[in-house]
Amino acid sequence: MRRLKLAALMLCLSQPVVAAAPPPPGTGIDAAIAAPSRSADNVKLDESRKPAEVLKFFGLRPGMHVIDLFGANRYWAEIIAPAVGPKGHVLVWEPTQFYKPDTKTAFEAFAAKTPNVSIISTPFEAPTLPRNSADFAMLNLDYHDTYWESQKYGIPHMEPAAFLKTLYAAMKPGGIVGVIDHVANPNSDTRATVERLHRIDPEVAKADFKRAGFQLVGESDILRNPADDHNLLVFDPKIRGKTDRFIFKFRKPR
């Protein structure tokens, strides 16, 4: 019996070792962030924006069709386009008020070498997005601007509900909207706070999206900063790039 056991053991040891199957390929987010083709100015923002953690939290995957709102600066598009791959697509929407000639030139050069990227530019007060088209939308540090008006920049008084109605219609059932914005103190006058500080109370943003029909399916503290007391303009050098920011993950019901 002992000889039989020994023979069986030797037979097992003589068999070739089969390597464990490699894990399924990831989203490509890390590789996209490390790509040398990214603009140097955008790479500098990574430390404060933590794009890998953010996009993984939102669930970005290859093949997704993405809307990058206010995205002509290319920060997110440079990462998302390679991450979603050739079967995915990134549609950037940029308000005409912000789509200045230098921004347009830089974006067109980027799009010329990135075949899965395109752009739509319409007035801020009249966003145009293809209906039922997006698996994911990124809204980074700009939702508060739907409460903003500026004679200098040609931005009229707007109703955030109208903006969200357009966004809701653009999302596929089950589509995810990732919202990041600068935190304002609670119970403040939203329009006055946006005008003065370019911040928004997280509960206001949350309520707006819920009224528009979206479901809140996740929150993250990746970009929270307890040292920010929410009283400085977000462009103030003392806090710029270090503001306390909320992250909400909304879904259009299936």
Tell me the role of every PLM-derived stretch.
Residues 63-72:
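Conserved class I S-adenosyl-L-methionine
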Residues 189-216:
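Conserved Class I S-adenosyl-L-methionine
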Residues 81-82, 154-173:
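A short glycine-rich, Lys/Arg-flanked "PGG" loop and its adjoining helix->strand segment in the class I
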Residues 62-63, 86-87, 171-177:
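Short glycine-dipeptide loop
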Residues 212, 227-254:
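Core SAM-dependent methyltransferase catalytic element
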Residues 64, 127-141:
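A short acidic, Gly/Pro-enriched loop at the edge of an enzyme's catalytic core
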Residues 102-131:
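S-adenosyl-L-methionine
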Residues 29-57, 61:
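Class I SAM-dependent methyltransferase Rossmann-like catalytic core
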